[in-house]
């Protein structure tokens, strides 16, 4: 139609905006430069990057340009450029996450992705599903709904905060499987503790029983390095506005090709070929500039390096975790083994409730966290980010030590 797809609108790459030869920078210098890419609130130390990762300025500037272009073209873009752009974006995202683009669709968040599967699965009366008490509430709610709607039995397990080994976790789920079990939902990373579960082993076990595995990877894409297909799960959902740091409202859903035909979409699509995954992602008109910016977020992460980011996030978590372990009245609710967590952790106090702890951290020390007080997890989730400094964590460490000595 004469106008090129929007992805070609701005020829300036993220790398050209940043102009940083990372190989010539000392590690501390590199992370100071990364910190400069963020507009940070001056009134508090942000240790709650779990809900939403704020978008770095290089990505944000591209997002604003995409908004301007979509607004300029209006309906022309929506009718003639949107679909080609979506294909390009999906292909790049699939390449990064390690799966075929024909098995991936862009959604708005993890809840949408996983609930599409839970609600769209062809349940029958008497079927059985398993998930954990530590799973995200929205998905637990959806399992409760299908239990009522289709008379499905649902069993909840409780994942230990400090497992002895992988086999303890695998056996926990295996012990609840029956001849009626159709699906296990499991967190790749438990959102309230940061614990990374042995997904490949869980999938291998479940598949021996003919049970499918739905993986909640809300906190994993852009957080640490892995391939979705190598997990051998049946379904995988994630939020891209978390650790990939896209603007709010971007997620993904992966479905193994053989399962696509049996899943009913939430909203009907004109695509009638049951083997096409695109039929699962119809939502009507939505903010397309967010989708477009996924490419820019991928470019920014490519500049940073996923291995380098993973190493930094794990370093930050271990920095405060090791400083607070074996301290009186302090409870660490996240495993210490390096492969069992990355950037997210959880710490509690025996002498103070989680809600009071979060309140005092904010009011007395200017530290923003979130209280967790359920499912055998009692503490504050601590989620630093690539912009977090060790000096900020020192403030947090000193604050927790001080609070552990209070009598309330």
Q: What is each of the regions a protein language model found here?
A:
Residues 2-408:
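Pyridoxal 5′-phosphate
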């Amino acid at each position: 139609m004469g106008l090129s797809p929007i992805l070609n609108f701005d020829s300036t790459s993220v790398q050209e905006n940043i102009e940083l030869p990372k190989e010539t920078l000392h590690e501390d210098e590199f992370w100071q430069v990364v910190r400069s890419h963020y507009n940070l609130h001056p009134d508090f130390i942000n240790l709650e990057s779990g809900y939403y990762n704020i978008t770095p300025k290089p990505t944000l500037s591209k997002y604003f340009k995409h908004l301007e272009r979509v607004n300029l073209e209006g309906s022309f873009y929506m009718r003639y450029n949107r679909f080609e752009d979506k294909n390009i974006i999906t292909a790049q995202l699939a390449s990064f996450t390690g799966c075929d683009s024909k098995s991936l669709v862009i959604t708005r968040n993890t809840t949408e992705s996983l609930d599409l599967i839970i609600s769209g699965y062809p349940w029958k009366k008497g079927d059985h599903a398993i998930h954990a008490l530590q799973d995200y509430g929205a998905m637990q709610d959806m399992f409760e709904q299908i239990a009522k709607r289709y008379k499905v039995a649902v069993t909840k397990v409780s994942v230990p905060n400090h497992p002895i080994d992988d086999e303890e976790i695998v056996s926990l789920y295996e012990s609840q499987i029956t001849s009626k079990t159709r699906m296990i939902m499991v967190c790749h990373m438990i959102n309230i503790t940061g614990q990374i579960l042995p997904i490949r082993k869980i999938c291998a076990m479940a598949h021996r029983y003919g049970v499918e595995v739905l993986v909640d990877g809300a906190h994993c894409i852009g957080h640490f390095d892995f391939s979705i297909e190598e997990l051998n799960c049946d379904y995988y959902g994630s939020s891209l506005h978390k650790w990939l740091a896209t603007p709010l409202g971007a997620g993904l859903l992966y479905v193994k090709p053989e399962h696509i035909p049996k899943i009913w979409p939430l909203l009907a699509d004109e695509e009638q070929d049951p083997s096409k995954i695109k039929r699962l992602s119809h939502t009507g008109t939505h903010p397309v500039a967010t989708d477009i910016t996924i490419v820019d977020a991928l470019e920014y992460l490519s500049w940073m390096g996923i291995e380098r980011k993973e190493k930094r996030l794990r370093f930050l978590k271990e920095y405060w975790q090791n400083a607070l372990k074996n301290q009186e009245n302090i409870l660490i609710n996240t495993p210490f083994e390096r492969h069992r967590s990355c950037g997210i952790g959880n710490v509690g106090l025996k002498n103070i409730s989680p809600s009071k702890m979060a309140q005092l951290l904010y009011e007395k020390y200017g530290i923003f966290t979130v209280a967790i007080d359920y499912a055998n997890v009692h503490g504050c989730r601590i989620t630093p980010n690539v912009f977090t400094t060790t000096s900020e964590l020192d403030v947090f460490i000193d604050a927790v030590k001080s609070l552990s000595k209070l009598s309330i």
